[in-house]
Amino acid sequence: MQVFLDNPKAFFETVSGWVWGPVMLMLLVGTGILLTVLLKGLQFTMLGYALKQAFVPPKKHKSGEGHEGDISHFAALMTALSATIGTGNIAGVATAVVTGGPGAVFWMWMTAIFGMATKYGEGVLAVKYRVNNSKGEMSGGPMYYIEKGLGKNWKWMALAFALFGTFASFGIGSSVQSNSVAQAVQTSFGIEPAYTGITLTVLTAVVVLGGIKGIAKAASFIVPAMAVFYVLGGLSIIAINSDALMPAVKLIFSDAFSAQAVAGGAIGTVIRYGVARGVFSNEAGMGSAPIAAAAAKTDHPVRQALVSMTGTFLDTIVVCSITGIVLVMGLLGAGGEFVKPEVSGAALTTVTFQKMLPGIGGWIVTIGLIFFAYSTILGWCYYGEKCAVYVFGEKFAGLYRVGYVSSVMLGTVLSLDLVWLASDTFNGLMALPNLIALLLMAKVIVNETRDFKQKITNGELPH
């Protein structure tokens, strides 16, 4: 305790380094690989079907009519993506490329491929073990499937997850995101952070005070719009600079397994940063997304789990790939070699987009960053509230929302190095109990999957 009081930053640096060390990364990827094997590559064989479940309108696809839940499959996916697609898609990918090299993009893809199985497993358990609260709303997520699926003896682990999730929401969910918006607005428009903070706080309060339905409604509009805007902007840059595309893709694959990296021991760095940033971006295994999945109207846990699985695909395989490929294209030297930049994070992404598309390239990143961060604030409010209510009770919900909205304002005017470190630590601590639960309940996930396929075959459920 004294170490923490004397130097809290050093304390969290040490703890975060341990939490997100090789063991955690192996556990995250290993869980995904195990579920992929047990589910016979479901993320490959059923991806098309899963995307259809997510995006076909309810009036044409009746899976959500007359079933328990608060919001549609699509709204649940957009709520999860609102929290998932954030500054990590812009700043996180840039950090991975600078620190781990172009090959880190390849390992980010690998993390997403196996992470889809993890996200699927989370979704199955979230819907299967969800409960109705006193307001008639659905509540679910790791804290519920740990307690109900593993038994009362595991209640301590459920409480630990929920407590860590509550703390994490005030950092990575609100303060860090609002700080990113304030900096971006000040850089691009010269507006003081305090004014941005007031505006962002009001916009957040208006939405989150309406609960999950308000958040889902906002997310269902913001997320598709911002994702399409950013992806189209990135694709335009790739098309305009198409001569650099193949050299960049070739470099991504060659650097992932380069003899030089293997011989020098750098291959571990390439893999570590690719895996770590991929996990931070798509949150597969962290246990956050299943909290939103539990609110979906569905006739079977597997149907919503398939929709949840597409979130990892859209976040990393689509959005992060755009950032990664444009960055590598922009950092190619005259001889096709990778030129390590002097800047990193969101600044590097902004500079590179501007270089590749003069005039508006930087604006694509700035506008994308603003909306990505704002949507993350909305999504994480729901996650944090559900965690807080599990620990402290339903009466705490109103107090939590007030505190969360206040942290949005604080984030725009404070230095957040410590908050970043603390949030990273709590996110990792969330993942540990969740991954343990997934491994212990892998058989449940497999059995539910078999049951769904059988009912589809027998005509008991709509296809």
Q: Where do the model's predicted regions map?
A:
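Membrane-embedded translocation segments of transport machinery
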Residues: 217-220, 226-289, 294
